[in-house]
Amino acid sequence: MQTSNYGSLPTSRSAVVLGNDERLRIERHLPLPALRPNEVLVQVKAVAINPCDYKMHQRFPCPGAVDGCDFAGVIVGVGPEVLKFGLGDRVCGAVHGSNPLRPESGSFTDYMTSESEFTLKIPAGLSFEQAVGMGVTGIGTLGMALFRTLQLPGSLDRPATKPRTVLVHGGSSSVGTMAIQLLRLLGHVPIATCSPKNFALARRFGAEEVFDYNSPDCAAAIKAYTKNTLSYILDPFTDAKSVDLCYKAMGRAGGRYCCLEMYPEYVLQRKSIKVGFVMGPLLLGHRLALSQGYERDEDPEMRAFGVEWYKDVQKMLDRGLLKRHPIKLLGDSFEALIEGVEMLQRKEVSGEKLVVALDSEQSKPVLTK
């Protein structure tokens, strides 16, 4: 690891981990994570909270594993194979939290490691809270969803010449507003569903039309608007209600349906609809030691795609092409972090991204080389 004249790293860290009772708790005096050759060590300044931050440890409990995915902070250590980052760089990214194969890898901590290939430089003018509010976990997942599962044409530098209409179910969620923006940048026409109170939010991020997903006539209204030709749907929820709505909204010829949760088997009954499932950690290409259909073997091809997608994401950040979802700052402590996870679990959050700054949990950065 690189060293410098700025002092030495602390000998321990604090983190939010899963306890033996399968509840999140704060653990102090944990060892710093080992830094692999392609990784950077980050002093975490802010984290964002995602639904996966409770779903992962609920479904695949691993006592002692550090929770959390999204992070923003300052690089205080650099592995020998890392060329594009240096000490003191402001960065953001996403890791696989609650990871049974690498339980130390989550972001809900004051010091963490991140693979350099999946780490982004924060542009000047963006605070740590604003950067983490972009939701890199969601951006990574959407790269797989739009290109690998929906197989949409177009790219950042060469938008599609024949725009496709794409339904984003839950368009006012943080994943939804980012999906809408990415679809616009790729040259497509996003339409969305959400509750009426968030119609303006979805439109502000670029939705062409918005439909009330609580209305019994929602699917019929979408079919009428698309003239029964809709053939691309992104569904972050993938529960019984959303599956029913999305299937009814799909055009008569069928199409591609991308789920961000594991889908029920009955969705495969309509042969004209090609169903696919993606989840954030898949982008890293590592083996997923999970269960219930979420397990995956190592995937070098997906990793190669992910590396290229992150290069595009860096370009979008540098060019100021992405707007962050509205954020709600919860505080500056690990206690606030646990409360935020519980708020999401209780479904108390709508139209906002929960963010926690961690400045009160740590001293000023110390850089080592």
Swiss-Prot record:
CDD domains attached to this UniProt entry: enoyl_reductase_like (cd08249)
TM region(s), chain numbering: none
Reported phenotype of the disruption mutant: Results in the complete abolition of pyrichalasin H and deacetylated pyrichalasin H production.
Residues annotated to bind NADP(+): 52-55, 195-198, 213, 260-261, 349-350
Family of this protein: Belongs to the zinc-containing alcohol dehydrogenase family.
Subunit-level organization: Monomer.
Protein name per UniProt: Trans-enoyl reductase pyiC
Organism: Pyricularia grisea
Record gene name: pyiC
